[in-house]
Amino acid sequence: MIISHRHRYLFVELPRTGSTAIRDELCGFYDGEPILSKHATYQEFLGAASVDEKRYFVFSAIRNPLDDAVSRYFKLRTDHKGRFSHARPGGHRRLVNRLLDNAMFGFLRRTDADFPTFFLRYYVLPYDTWASLSHRRFDFVMRFENLAADFEKALRQIGIEPVRPLALVNPTGARQRDFAYYYPPETWGRARRVFGPYMEKWGYGFPAEWGIQGPSTLHRAQYLLCGLVARFYWRVVRPLT
């Protein structure tokens, strides 16, 4: 999480949305400074912020979950920056995330599984992120798919003139194609059920060639039910781990 008291902004870092690139730019060129933890939620900030800081311009980013799942797979498969084989105890990853990452990393090391196998094994419950807690309340939400242009828009809304184009930081290794390439037809039904409600919520659509219109009523109900549990975890349990 990055704050600037000079420019009165707060950047909330949702994982795998280009937050490292944004963080580096804000701290290097726009008077930003880290506070709390890298992936602290806005609720955690509100618990520590002054009345004046709560009025700051708040922005973050969102990403298509179809793309996010592929990125996660390749980060695990390539042991991105030794993050999984040499993970530090604690760190900015919370306990549940570390346990899940360790399980996924171990599975890929043992099996060398391709993405469809990985996806069908680990993407079972409705997909959600803690963007569902408060992103709707933010002043601006960037799209990972249009990150450089959206970052410039955010800066100008804050009242800052960009000093340079956004630099690419922390790219996922080994991945060479658009996310749709990694989803064969046997994964489409699962993707619709797991990702559909979240994609609908944030205005994403499935690739046209899939012929998928969106989630069913049952899928939406499952998403809402699981979301109750997820929000309790993000609000109450996650800050303690």
Residue ranges and their predicted role:
Residues M1-T241:
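Membrane-interface amphipathic segments in extracytoplasmic regions
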